[in-house]
């Protein structure tokens, strides 16, 4: 019932791909230095899910011998845990695939070219506390009944963002510095979605609802069927375009 160290060196590829495919667990991750691509610790109190690390020229996969995608065990000390740090030496693509897990990631300053997240249930928190030094082609998050909290999304430096999910709560904060034009698409079912945008960011939000509701706070002006911040009305700076398809839930728009 001990800890297993994790050490993954940078592969030969210029833009490598890191895939994390794990069962129900708790995972925290943050930025590190330049020495290693991935470093950290894996803790399995059951000794029943041995760690597997597959390293190839194009990237690496962190997974388990027999991943369990059920609920995170609530018993004291019963949940497997990952504590990871990502290097900042070279840009890379990141894929996360998991079941009913609790994820808490701060990827501020980590050079990411692409992120794909597929999670069944649980909780997923992602923060970009510092700007991404690389241009991110796509940020994609797909969930089942997972509660999602994404912070400082402008710092992710994405060109396109796609978020889809079922019955859960979504809090999306587009804080940070918007370095270029970006588009975000949100598609949810029976979900409460809160979208927050800095008042200084040029943002255009198009809401699409079936039986859902839209609550628009101060700082937005309706124009041509969309909700625009003052910088967007004035044509100042890069523009963040958000399409929010909230079919049966509620959408709240706020400026910060």
Kindly label every feature range from the protein language model.
Residues 95-134:
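Right-handed parallel beta-helix
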């Amino acid at each position: 019932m001990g800890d297993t160290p994790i050490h993954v060196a940078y592969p030969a590829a210029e833009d490598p791909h890191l895939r994390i495919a794990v069962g129900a667990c708790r995972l925290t991750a943050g930025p590190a230095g330049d020495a290693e691509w991935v470093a950290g610790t894996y803790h399995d109190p059951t000794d029943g899910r041995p760690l597997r690390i597959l390293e190839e020229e194009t990237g690496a996969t962190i997974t388990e011998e027999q991943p369990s995608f059920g609920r995170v065990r609530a018993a004291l000390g019963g949940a497997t845990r990952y504590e990871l740090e990502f290097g900042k030496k070279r840009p890379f693509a990141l894929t996360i695939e998991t079941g009913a897990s609790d994820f808490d990631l701060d990827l501020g300053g980590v050079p990411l070219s692409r992120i794909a997240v597929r999670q069944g249930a649980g909780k997923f928190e992602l923060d970009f506390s510092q700007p991404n030094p690389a241009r991110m082609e796509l940020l994609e998050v797909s969930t089942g009944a997972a509660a999602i909290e994404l912070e400082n999304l402008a710092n992710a430096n994405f060109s396109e963002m796609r978020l889809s999910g079922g019955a859960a709560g979504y809090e999306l904060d587009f804080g940070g510095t918007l370095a270029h034009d970006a588009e975000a698409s949100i598609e949810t079912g029976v979900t409460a979605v809160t979208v927050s945008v800095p008042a200084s960011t040029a943002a255009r939000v198009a809401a699409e609802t079936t039986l859902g509701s839209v609550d628009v706070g101060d700082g937005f002006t309706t124009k041509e069927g969309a909700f625009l911040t003052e910088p967007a009305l004035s044509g100042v700076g890069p523009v963040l375009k958000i399409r929010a398809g909230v079919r049966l839930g509620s959408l709240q728009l706020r400026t910060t």
